[in-house]
A protein has these predicted regions:
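N-terminal accessory segment detector
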Residues: 1-79, 84-102, 119-133, 138-140
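Conserved short hydrophobic interaction patches
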Residues: 17, 109-112, 116
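ATP phosphate-binding glycine-rich loop and adjacent ATP-lid/helix-beta elements
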Residues: 101-111
């Protein structure tokens, strides 16, 4: 099986290609396509376990990516403070020109999370160093 880190450079190039040929909206459409068709594991975990499912999903993914992060899991709140995004780190070390909106691709999770009664907020703190905050709160 191919690890998620092996896709980073390919994703970056695809994002740049789509943007250059068809504009940023086409990149966003692609992210929505991924969300709709390739994140069934996240959707199942959120539907069945809520916040605990989010923690399970991202613990697995971020461990595989060797991310530096802090996760907070509460009854009604879930947060990931990304101290050093491995995707951004890999892109910075490579000779590839990083797609300027690369960090925005994490928005593809929003649609799934919000479908199950949660508010999803993402704050990109430093896109050059790969620092961001993802916050999910259960809606009342």
């Amino acid at each position: 099986m191919i690890s998620c880190t092996e896709f980073i450079l390919a994703y970056n190039e695809l994002f740049k290609f789509l943007h250059e040929k068809y504009g940023k909206d086409s990149v966003i459409d692609f992210w929505e396509y991924i969300s709709d068709n390739f994140l069934q594991n996240l959707e199942n975990l959120v539907r069945e376990k809520g916040i605990a499912g989010m923690a399970e999903y991202w613990t697995h993914t971020l461990t595989e990516e060797k991310a530096e992060y802090q996760m907070s899991v509460g009854e009604n709140c879930f947060e990931i403070y990304m101290k050093k995004c491995p995707s951004v780190g890999l892109l910075n070390k490579s000779k590839a020109v990083k797609y300027p909106h690369y960090c925005e691709h994490c928005i593809l999770y929003k649609k799934i999370i919000e479908k199950y009664g949660f508010a999803y907020e993402e704050n990109i703190i430093d896109k050059e160093r790969g620092i961001c905050l993802l916050k999910v709160v259960r809606k009342d």
